[in-house]
Amino acid sequence: MKIFIDTANVEEIRKASELGVLSGVTTNPSLIAKEGRDLKEVVEEICNIVDGPISAEVISLEYEKMIEEGRELSKLHKNIVIKIPMCEEGLKAVSVLSKEGIKTNVTLIFSSMQALLAARAGATYVSPFLGRLDDIGNPGIEVVEQIADMFKIHEIKTEIIAASVRTPMHVLEAAMAGSHIATIPYKVIIQMSKHALTDIGIEKFMKDYEKAFGENK
């Protein structure tokens, strides 16, 4: 399973990229607004850091404007993926853009049927939201499993991006459920690298080394 980072914070993206684990980036209007910067400016800077799919979301909910925004965003860089919300207007836009060779990521997926429609419309990616489904008592991972099974049975090439990831356990569950990608906040990526026994082991190695060879050797 590939790892994307879910943020518009360029510093977080740069730090995660230095770990050598990133395959792409997802952003959304809320994340861009949080940074207080121009969308195109942020996206272009991200493209210079990560050589992989960069999802940039349209703002409009009207079919024609979605297409217009998508075309403009796609001109920024070859790695741009147009992120479009799951709705009737969005499906129409995905169909048009995909036929033009523009990659799309249908977001705000909360059911396997939504994922099927998005895939058949031509979406490159679908993004089911784990955390938000969990919030309403509907285990998000079950939806990911359904989508993964359905895509496999029917040989659908659309890739699954597990989104609304809040914990390392969400990442593990997504990987085991068959998600192709998990898009993860920076803090969760860092949490994934930690373990109490690792810290204890490192501390012991350092103490043993200092005992044998002296400090700062």
UniProtKB/Swiss-Prot annotation:
Q: Which GO terms describe its cellular component?
A: cytoplasm
Q: EC no.?
A: 2.2.1.2
Task: Determine if Hydrolase is one of this entry's keywords.
Answer: no
Biological process terms from the Gene Ontology for this record are: carbohydrate metabolic process; pentose-phosphate shunt
**What is the designated name of this protein?**
Probable transaldolase
Similarity annotation: Belongs to the transaldolase family. Type 3B subfamily.
Q: Which UniProt keywords apply?
A: Cytoplasm, Pentose shunt, Schiff base, Transferase
Recorded catalytic activity of this chain's protein: D-sedoheptulose 7-phosphate + D-glyceraldehyde 3-phosphate = D-erythrose 4-phosphate + beta-D-fructose 6-phosphate
Write down the species. Clostridium botulinum (strain Hall / ATCC 3502 / NCTC 13319 / Type A)
Cited function: Transaldolase is important for the balance of metabolites in the pentose-phosphate pathway.
Q: What does the record give as the active site?
A: K83
Where it sits in the cell: the answer is: Cytoplasm
Q: In which pathway does it act?
A: Carbohydrate degradation; pentose phosphate pathway; D-glyceraldehyde 3-phosphate and beta-D-fructose 6-phosphate from D-ribose 5-phosphate and D-xylulose 5-phosphate (non-oxidative stage): step 2/3
Q: What are the GO MF terms of this UniProt record?
A: aldehyde-lyase activity; transaldolase activity
InterPro entries tied to this protein: Aldolase_TIM (IPR013785), TAL/FSA (IPR001585), Transaldolase_3B (IPR022999), Transaldolase_3B/F6P_aldolase (IPR004731), Transaldolase_AS (IPR018225), TSA/FSA_arc/bac (IPR033919)
